[in-house]
Each structure stands twice: as structure tokens, then as C-alpha cells.
Amino acid sequence: MTSDIHLSLAQIHNLLISREKSVEEVTQACLDRIIATEPTINAFITICAEEALSEAKKLDQSTPDPKKPLWGIPIAVKDNILTKNIPTTAASCMLKHFIPQYDAFIIQQLKNAGAIIIGKTNLDEFAMGSSTETSFFGPTYNPWNTKCVPGGSSGGSAASVAAFQCFSAIGTDTGGSIRQPAALCGCIGLKPTYGRVSRYGIIAYASSLDQAGPITRTVEDAAIMLSVLAKHDPQDTTSSFKATDNYYINLKKQDLTGITIGIPKEFISEHIDPPILDIYQQAIEQAKELGAKTIDLSLPHATDHAIATYYIIATAEASSNLARFDGVRYGYRAKNSHTLEELYINSRTKGFGEEVKRRILLGTHVLSTDYYENYYHKAAQVRYLILQDFLSVFKKCDILLTPVSPITAWEIGSTIKKPITIYHKDIFTVSLNLAGLPGLSIPAGLVKGLPVGIQLIGQAFDESTLLSIGNILHKYLGPTSQPNL
């Protein structure tokens, strides 16, 4: 059974529907893998063993439903997404005992598709980070090298997929938090277009930037997951009415003939380590061999300008969103507070970690009367310029190809006290969130045994093209080895 946990979603689905494997034994195999590897990687905050096995037994007693693409398949979920009667902590002391009374919209979609929620994965506290080191429940470790970070903030989701603890995991992406950990863990990471997937029931970090998406081991699996998740939700006012596709069926292209790929010159800079630049350039050459035409383009505001813009807008929105955690309505409540003001101060001081407090303070500062025009208003203007840059280059190409991370996974603890250094690791990812565009991270090689990813950037609501091109490239790129766990 051990080999079955290495199968794709489509493969394990076929075995379950045909009754060649029972849902219970597949679920138990994933739980056994979690038990064996969790002491090493700490990918989960909550493991839903009892609930998952109970649901598996129910499904085994029912008639398999081939129309449900995730029927009987164990899926992991990032722990900032609400799950009814299952703790949802956002990896924070503030919510360590919080149990939601309803499911997020995307959890409903997973269940409607037949999925089994096997557990809630670790993350940077309130999804604020790039390494999954700021979690109240301890850091997650990279399955490829457990001395290194898995990336973040969806590091637990990426590590769980890379370690074969589940068949897919859901993450959220505010500035690269699906794509970057997927790249550092050798997985596929898809950030859909803003509005493609509902945010209802996701604990908000930055509402105009947040987007949920899948982390998988193949592009085909990402297409299956997106087909499940991408539905209009009237509970989310930013949820798109645009029609969605069966993204899996649409993976028809065999080569890249007729495709024009844009190469933004700003993404080839001193920020990127030379071995990663080599892999990126090899990916460009591979695309050409597969029939693509490449052209050099410019996105003048999409790197250094984007970092500053992102950290102003994201922290401003975080300051507003996290104001609700005050020790009164729900969440951590400090004891021995004699006044309401003391209760607020003590609850938030003890309930939030250092990085969350840093971002709240920064966001409050840029929204203050004296600094709003110079910071937040100016950042909103630059955000518009970033979007215009992308709209301009997409008149000349079908898709963009860039690096994901300027470096491979770094050693745990090496940058935790260097916030500016950590922020700059998002330099190739944040511009997509500011522009609301879809991005796909795929493995492209190894450097000293650590995975390197490349990023495909698509036009708004054209995930079909993004996945189709990514599927072709993934078959010719990336590590063929697996983490040695």
C-alpha cells in the first residue's frame, strides 16, 4: 500500500472508484505516513485521524461516485481556512482553541467532490511569513533537507504533499505563499486569478490580495483541484461570475508550437543566485525546443517597486483585519486585566507573535493621518502601474516565465531576526497578487539537493492556458528524485 500514496489524484481515484482499493486503506496509508514523518517535518497542526477514518468507512459502505473527482481521497488544508468542528488556529496563540461552527466555501466544495479532510497544516502565524518559522506550534521542516525551511506561509501544505502525507493540500497565497513553498519543496503550486476561488471562510490577512489554491505533485492534479475549487460564491463579494472550465480535460496541448513566452528582464538581476539563474535559463531553452517563441519584455515596476508596494498595502489591510482579535469577541483572552484597555493590550500582546505585531504596527503607521498620502495612497498608485505593466506585455505574449524564489530553501533560524531579508525573498511573486493574476510554480531542477522552481504567469482568468503550458514544461523539467524521508 505504501506505493499507492505516491500516485496522482486521477490514478488513486480510478483505484477507489473501481474498488481495487478501499477508501479506508488509502486513508490509513496516509495516516501511517503522517505518523512516520511528522516528528521529522511537523507539517500538521491538527491530524483528523478519527474523523477521516470514520468518513472513509462511510464511503466504503456507499456506492462509488465517478462524477466526484476527489471521491475518497485524503486532502490536507491550511489551518487558516475554517473547518466545521475542527480547530482552526491560523498557527497563532490568539486562536489556539478556536473551533469554527461552519466550513469555508472551498471546504464545502472539497466535501462535495468527495474529499476526506485528513488534517490542518502548519503555516506562518496568520499567513504572515515566507518560511513557516513564525508558527505558534513550531516550524515546519523541509522534507528534502530537514535543516532547511519549507518556505511559507503555506509551508505545512507544501511539506505534506512533498512528503506523501496526502495527495494534495490547499494553501493560501497573499504574496507568494503557495508558489514559493511549492518551489522550495519540489511541488506544483497554483495561485488562481483573484476572485476565481472564494475567500469566504478564510481568515483574512490582506483581503485584496488573498487567494486560495492547490499544492500538488503534478499539473494534472492542480487542474483537477482547481476544477473543484473554482465556483462562484455569493457569500464573497469579490467572487467572479466568469465561467470556469474543466481544467483537467483541457490539458490537451502536446507541445508549445504557436506559444509566445515573455521573459521579463527585471527578473534576471543581482537578486537571484547564479545556480538558480542557470536552471531558469535552461527552462527557457527547453521551452524553445518544445516549439515556443520567446521575447524579452520589461515590467519596470514588478520587482523592487512591487516589494515596497506590497508590504505597505498588505500590512495596512492586516492592521484592519486583525483589529477584531481583541480578547472580547473570541480568541485569546488575557487574565488579570482590570480595565478594558488593559484587556485589549494584554490579549493582543500575548496573543500575537512578533512578526504579526510588526506588520500590524507597520500597517497602522501607513494608514495614519500624517502618513496615508505618502505611503498607502502612493502604494495604491504604484499598484495600478504594476497592473498596467502586465496588461501591456500580454499584448505581445501568451504567458510569462520567471523564477519563483531568488534562492533555494535556507537554513532554519538563519533569517528569522532579519525581516527585511525575508521580505525580499518575495521579490518574484508579490507582483502577481498586486495585479490579481494567476501564477503556477513548477519544479525545474535541484541545486545541492534542494528543489528549484520556475513560475508561469498567465492572463487574468486564463488558468486553462497556464495549466496547459505548465503541464508540458513539467514533463521535461524538474527533479525525478524524491525526498529521502
Curated annotation (Swiss-Prot):
Q: Does the keyword ATP-binding apply?
A: yes
The record ties this protein, via PROSITE patterns, to: AMIDASES
Its gene is: gatA
Give the coiled coil ranges.
Answer: none
Q: How does it assemble?
A: Heterotrimer of A, B and C subunits.
Which keywords accompany this UniProt record?
A: ATP-binding, Ligase, Nucleotide-binding, Protein biosynthesis
Which Pfam family name is an example for this entry?
A: Amidase
Q: What is its EC number?
A: 6.3.5.7
Keyword ATP-binding in the entry? The reply is yes
The UniProt function text for this chain reads:
Allows the formation of correctly charged Gln-tRNA(Gln) through the transamidation of misacylated Glu-tRNA(Gln) in organisms which lack glutaminyl-tRNA synthetase. The reaction takes place in the presence of glutamine and ATP through an activated gamma-phospho-Glu-tRNA(Gln).
GO CC annotation: glutamyl-tRNA(Gln) amidotransferase complex
Active site residues according to the UniProt entry: K78, S153, S177
Task: Return the protein name.
Answer: Glutamyl-tRNA(Gln) amidotransferase subunit A
What enzyme category does the UniProt record give? Answer: ligase
Q: Give the domain of life.
A: Bacteria
Matches recorded under SUPFAM superfamilies: Amidase signature (AS) enzymes (SSF75304)
- Please give the family membership noted in the entry: Belongs to the amidase family. GatA subfamily.
Q: Which reaction does it catalyse?
A: L-glutamyl-tRNA(Gln) + L-glutamine + ATP + H2O = L-glutaminyl-tRNA(Gln) + L-glutamate + ADP + phosphate + H(+)
Q: Name one GO biological process term.
A: translation
- Please name the taxonomic classification of the source: Bacteria, Pseudomonadati, Thermodesulfobacteriota, Desulfovibrionia, Desulfovibrionales
GO MF annotation terms: ATP binding; glutaminyl-tRNA synthase (glutamine-hydrolyzing) activity
InterPro entries in the cross-refs: Amidase (IPR000120), Amidase_CS (IPR020556), Amidase_dom (IPR023631), AS_sf (IPR036928), GatA (IPR004412)
